[in-house]
Amino acid sequence: LIILKLSFHKCQFMKKLLFIISIATLAACQPSPNLDGVAEKPAVADLLSAIQLKGDSTKVVLTDYFPDNKVVDSITIPDFFRYSYSPDSASITLVANNLNLPPLSIIQVWVKGNERYDLLVRKSKKLPVAFTFDPEGKKVKSVQLAGQINDWNPNATSLTFDGKVFRTTLLLNPGKYHYQVVVNGKWMLDPANPLKEDNGMGGQNSVVEVGNLKPNMLPKLVALTAHKNILNIKATGTVDSIIVLWQNYLLTGNFIKRDGDVFHVTLPRNAEEYSRSYIRVWAYNEFGESNDLLIPLEGCRVVEDPGKLTRSDKHTQVMYFLMVDRFNNGTTANDRKVDDPEILPKANYFGGDLVGVTQKIKDGYFTSLGINTIWLSPITQNPLGAWGLYPNPRTKFSGYHGYWPVSLTKIDFRYGTDGDLRELIDEAHSRNMNVILDYVANHIHVEHPLYKQHPDWTTSLYLPDGSLNTERWDEYRLTTWFDVFLPTLDLQRPEVYEPMTDTALYWLTNFQLDGFRHDATKHIHENFWRRLTQKIKLKVTDRSIYQIGETYGSRELVASYIGSGMLDSQFDFNIYDASVAAFARSNYPFSSLNSSLLESFSYFGWNNLMGYISGNQDRGRFISYAGGALRFDEDAKKAGWTREIGVGDTSAYSKLCMLNAFNLTIPGVPTIYYGDEFGMPGGNDPDNRRMMKFDNLSPIENRTLDVVKKLVNLRRNTMALNYGNFETLLADSTQYAYARTYLQSSAIVVFNKSDEDKSIIFKLPDYMVGRNFTSKFGSNSSIQNQIVKVDLKPNSFEILISK
């Protein structure tokens, strides 16, 4: 080892930082088998996320991993990296030699002298992709690209004319990308690319597929068995190396023993001091990395009983999103509509409140559904008047939804009081439910006192050319205003993000909330998210806090806000779009949904905390699309204003059950939008925000509700559906089957979206041979010679659970 001792006098966080650069390979630098680097009270309690290397260089901000980075003493960096250190930002910039860099590697951080943390590093998978456009002799001033490659922002990617053609080369991760060419401002399909696909809105996009993916050549991992303090991991395919972390500590030497394709992991005795800790496992070979495993421990034993899981185990959440004003009116004493004749009834207050939510908690509605996390829409004070304008039919709007704050700490009197919120949280906690709050950080309303006191704290309403900077979602995503009366806060500036993060923290320190859903995440500078998360980790240490964001855009953009120091997750709208298309439309194949899901896993991990939704307040209701009452090629908002939107064909209820079955059986956090448990119809905003219906459900609505209750119960009580691996068994145009296994718990999920009875036939994975399964939804099934057959009716599903 060469030890470089460097003092950084400019650094305000660290007096000294030592970089220890390994000349030998990292594999030769094995930590002590006794895990001597584990502290009794670790400086970091959370699982530290992997460092995802980007193109040429990657910036690693130390406070992302160590909120109090004064404790960091030294860092061990493998010799296939070059590095630089910035004392001003307390960050390291890594430059990797991709020729020698394995798919996965480890960087070690030493804290307080001898306390060690091992950070996983994932190699960049980006590949160069060339795009060209031939003007064919025509006069062309500009050629741009817009698509999933750049979040549909044509100004982000311009092609250069070389005298013959326009061209550019982009670095893209493996996957499928929709895009269009923008020529002289006109959007069109790429004339040089014959590949195109439906865009889900009645049109088409060009498609580019990046990378020669060989998923069958990658290693696959499954947690096979556990006995006392031994965990047995089976690997399928060639494994060049396996990486096992307990918490944030690499296990090597006697902790890992290989016997053919099975790895025996001895759990460290340090785990005895923890009521909950985790084993994380990855493997790789020359073709890339495997799926990852997450294994919860209780003491020095693997958790196998779902009864031992708690609401603090984030991966076991089943979330329910309700709009407070539209859920239940618990008391009419606080009812107050906006008295303005220009507001049509749909856009005014309906009277729902916090007392109404608490009543439904006490009544057992959420318990009967199986929900363990309630997501409340924003509850801060909103304006008393009418704002905005919709042209046809002409109407203004109230702030019934809660997204127009005129205060950041005061509860809107139309929703209730501080005491009402505390009672709601207490009642939820007493029933083992979390409560997370929808928090609006991006903007305030013009009536907010802050705007009058500090108008300079906002971005400009006007662009340099004099045009309005409103609804420029992608082109000016960090500065755009949502409307002329909603100033965007300039949250990259310390004088703005410091008080604003304190305000967000207020809700966690004054109420026992369990987390946030963050509105408009991609429109907020990362400085805000880093500072907020740092404050939460330093000041809210008595409970687990879950932060989930909202970003519409590419997976790369979504992922940029996730990780240690940022958010736990975001909602995966790319999967939502694919699942809506797959389950509501006959011409979108399951194979495309499966490919999209695997692509999400490659960005967010196979044991992610992403939100997988049945719908939300910004989309037309799924059931109305599935039944044909709402068309994919129409303006769903206009449709909701101009006609009564119903369900349409009753097959939509079966399709809704399939969508809920999908969300509740894949990795991630399944999220039910209120009313989707029985099939509430509607167009887009505000028609998708009708008053919740608890009584007088039709027979088919009751059957749908019963199916969803059963699905949630299966999710909550099947370890494989919370922590199991994911393996695709069949995916074609109308048939889909996948399996999840966690030790002795296995689940097989099968779909038939055709209009006729089908026998779905597929092969059982070798490691599941010998397990006995039972059909939970009444379909006939059989297994003979490793071949599974499940008989399914049209638009139906089945879940087989190992006995």
Where are the predicted features?
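Substrate-binding/active-site clefts of carbohydrate-active enzymes
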Residues: 313, 317, 325-511, 531-541, ...
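Active-site-proximal helices and loops of the catalytic beta/alpha 8
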Residues: 44, 49, 58, 503-505, ...
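Aromatic-rich carbohydrate-binding modules that target alpha-glucans
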Residues: 120-174, 184-211, 243-265
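Loop/helix patches that line or flank the sugar-binding groove of alpha-linked glycan CAZymes
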Residues: 314, 330-349, 601-769, 792, ...
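Solvent-exposed, low-complexity, repeat-rich "mucin-like" stalks and linkers
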Residues: 34-79, 220-237
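C-terminal beta-strand-rich structural cap/linker in extracellular carbohydrate-active enzymes
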Residues: 178-179, 784-803
